[in-house]
Amino acid sequence: TVVTWNPLLAEVAATPKTSQLFNSSQIPGEIIDLMVVNTKTLADNPNLGKALTGAWYEVMGIMSSDTPQGKEARSKMAAASGTDLKGFEAQLAATKMFYTAKDAHAFALSKELPATMTKVAQFSFKHGLLGEGAKSAEAIGIQFAGSQTGNAKNIKLRFDPTYLKLAADGQIK
C-alpha cells in the first residue's frame, strides 16, 4: 500500500497490477490549498493581504485560461511539480479549484466549511496530530466568518474571508 498524491500518484497508478483504494474526491473540502499568513502580521499589514490575494487570483486567472499565456503558465507549473503539461492538466481536472475569488468567498462563508473542519479536527485528534497535551478534538479553535469551533481561547486557524470579498467585489487589482 502506498499513500501519495499527484504527480507521483499518476506514475504509481500506471504501474501494472495497481489499484486505487481511495482519493481525495471522496472527502470534498477536507484538503484545501490555502495561503496562510500570521494573524498579527496581516493585521499590521493589510496591504500584504490585498497583494497576496490579488497575485493569487491573477495567477489563477492566467492558469485557467485557454490562451497561449495560460498554456505557458501550466507548462511551467507542470515542470516545477515534476510532470508534463498533459499530466498537470489531468491533475487539475481531478482537483476542485477555486479559480475565482467569488467561488472561494462562497466556500469560506458556507456551512460546510466549519462542519468539514470539525471532522478534520476529530481526525487529527484521533491520530495524535494536535499534540501530546490535546485532551479532545476541541483543544484547538478554528475561526470562521461569524462562528468558531473548538477552544475559543486557543484559536490556531482562521478562515478570514475579508480579502476574498474584496477580490470578489473587484476592489483588489
Q: What feature does the model see in each segment?
A:
Residues T118-K173:
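Conserved C-terminal helix/tail region of periplasmic/extracytoplasmic solute-binding proteins
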Residues E30-I32, T83:
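Extracytoplasmic
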Residues T1-T4, Q20:
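Paired acidic/hydrophobic, glycine-rich loop segments that form the ligand-binding mouth/hinge
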Residues E11-S24:
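Ligand-binding "clamshell"
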Residues V3-A10, I31, N38:
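Beta->alpha turn/N-cap motifs
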